Swiss-Prot record:
Belongs to the bacterial ribosomal protein bL21 family. GO terms for biological process: translation. This protein binds to 23S rRNA in the presence of protein L20. The lineage of its organism: Bacteria, Pseudomonadati, Aquificota, Aquificia, Aquificales. It comes from Aquifex aeolicus (strain VF5). One of its GO terms (molecular function) is rRNA binding. GO terms for cellular component: cytoplasm; ribonucleoprotein complex; ribosome. It holds the Pfam family Ribosomal_L21p. This is Large ribosomal subunit protein bL21. Keywords: Ribonucleoprotein, Ribosomal protein, RNA-binding, rRNA-binding. PANTHER family: 50S RIBOSOMAL PROTEIN L21 (PTHR21349), LARGE RIBOSOMAL SUBUNIT PROTEIN BL21M (PTHR21349:SF0). InterPro entries: bL21-like (IPR028909), bL21-like_sf (IPR036164), Ribosomal_bL21 (IPR001787), Ribosomal_bL21_CS (IPR018258). Part of the 50S ribosomal subunit. Contacts protein L20. HAMAP family: Ribosomal_bL21 (MF_01363).
Amino acid sequence: MYAVIKTGGKQYKVEKGMKLKVEKLPYEVGQTVEFEALMLRKDDGSIEFNKGKVIAEVKAHGRGKKLIVFKYRPKKNYKRWKGHRQPYTEIEIKDILP
Protein backbone atom coordinates (compact mmCIF):
# COMPACT_ATOMS: atom_id res chain seq x y z
CA MET A 1 0.00 0.00 0.00
CA TYR A 2 1.24 3.48 -0.76
CA ALA A 3 -0.10 7.00 -0.45
CA VAL A 4 0.59 10.45 -1.86
CA ILE A 5 0.88 13.24 0.72
CA LYS A 6 1.35 16.98 0.35
CA THR A 7 3.55 19.05 2.65
CA GLY A 8 5.62 22.17 2.12
CA GLY A 9 4.11 22.78 -1.31
CA LYS A 10 5.38 19.42 -2.63
CA GLN A 11 3.83 16.00 -3.08
CA TYR A 12 5.54 12.78 -1.96
CA LYS A 13 4.77 9.14 -2.71
CA VAL A 14 5.26 7.30 0.59
CA GLU A 15 5.17 3.74 1.88
CA LYS A 16 5.27 2.33 5.39
CA GLY A 17 8.77 2.40 6.90
CA MET A 18 10.07 4.97 4.41
CA LYS A 19 12.32 7.85 5.54
CA LEU A 20 12.29 11.16 3.70
CA LYS A 21 13.32 14.80 4.03
CA VAL A 22 10.56 17.40 3.78
CA GLU A 23 10.41 21.16 4.26
CA LYS A 24 10.86 22.16 7.90
CA LEU A 25 7.91 21.26 10.14
CA PRO A 26 7.14 22.92 13.52
CA TYR A 27 7.34 19.68 15.54
CA GLU A 28 9.90 18.39 18.04
CA VAL A 29 12.01 15.28 17.45
CA GLY A 30 10.03 12.21 18.48
CA GLN A 31 6.58 13.73 17.97
CA THR A 32 4.10 12.14 15.58
CA VAL A 33 2.73 14.04 12.60
CA GLU A 34 -0.49 13.25 10.73
CA PHE A 35 -0.88 13.99 7.01
CA GLU A 36 -4.01 13.76 4.88
CA ALA A 37 -3.56 11.37 1.95
CA LEU A 38 -4.29 12.93 -1.45
CA MET A 39 -4.31 9.49 -3.03
CA LEU A 40 -4.29 6.03 -1.48
CA ARG A 41 -3.56 2.80 -3.37
CA LYS A 42 -4.51 -0.33 -1.49
CA ASP A 43 -2.96 -3.77 -1.83
CA ASP A 44 -5.95 -5.06 -3.80
CA GLY A 45 -5.28 -2.45 -6.52
CA SER A 46 -8.11 -0.04 -5.71
CA ILE A 47 -7.38 3.68 -5.59
CA GLU A 48 -9.10 6.21 -3.35
CA PHE A 49 -8.74 9.98 -3.54
CA ASN A 50 -8.80 12.40 -0.57
CA LYS A 51 -9.26 9.56 1.91
CA GLY A 52 -6.92 8.08 4.45
CA LYS A 53 -4.27 9.36 6.80
CA VAL A 54 -0.53 8.93 7.00
CA ILE A 55 1.15 8.88 10.40
CA ALA A 56 4.84 9.79 10.59
CA GLU A 57 7.41 10.39 13.31
CA VAL A 58 9.90 13.28 13.29
CA LYS A 59 13.43 11.84 13.36
CA ALA A 60 15.64 14.92 12.98
CA HIS A 61 15.91 18.53 11.86
CA GLY A 62 18.76 19.77 9.71
CA ARG A 63 19.99 22.08 7.01
CA GLY A 64 20.75 21.16 3.41
CA LYS A 65 23.93 21.68 1.44
CA LYS A 66 25.11 25.25 1.01
CA LEU A 67 24.10 27.01 -2.19
CA ILE A 68 26.03 30.06 -3.37
CA VAL A 69 24.18 33.03 -4.87
CA PHE A 70 26.56 35.30 -6.79
CA LYS A 71 25.57 38.64 -8.31
CA TYR A 72 27.94 40.33 -10.73
CA ARG A 73 27.78 43.50 -12.84
CA PRO A 74 30.46 43.70 -15.50
CA LYS A 75 32.69 46.80 -15.59
CA LYS A 76 31.12 48.25 -12.41
CA ASN A 77 33.21 46.52 -9.70
CA TYR A 78 30.00 45.07 -8.20
CA LYS A 79 30.14 41.55 -6.76
CA ARG A 80 27.95 40.02 -4.06
CA TRP A 81 28.30 36.52 -2.57
CA LYS A 82 25.55 35.04 -0.47
CA GLY A 83 25.09 31.52 0.87
CA HIS A 84 21.84 29.70 1.63
CA ARG A 85 21.11 26.45 3.47
CA GLN A 86 17.51 25.26 3.31
CA PRO A 87 16.15 23.83 6.60
CA TYR A 88 14.47 20.43 6.46
CA THR A 89 12.80 17.85 8.70
CA GLU A 90 13.51 14.15 8.36
CA ILE A 91 10.45 11.97 8.98
CA GLU A 92 9.76 8.24 9.03
CA ILE A 93 6.39 6.89 7.88
CA LYS A 94 4.95 4.74 10.67
CA ASP A 95 1.53 3.80 9.30
CA ILE A 96 -0.92 4.40 6.46
CA LEU A 97 -4.56 4.29 7.53
CA PRO A 98 -7.39 3.87 4.99
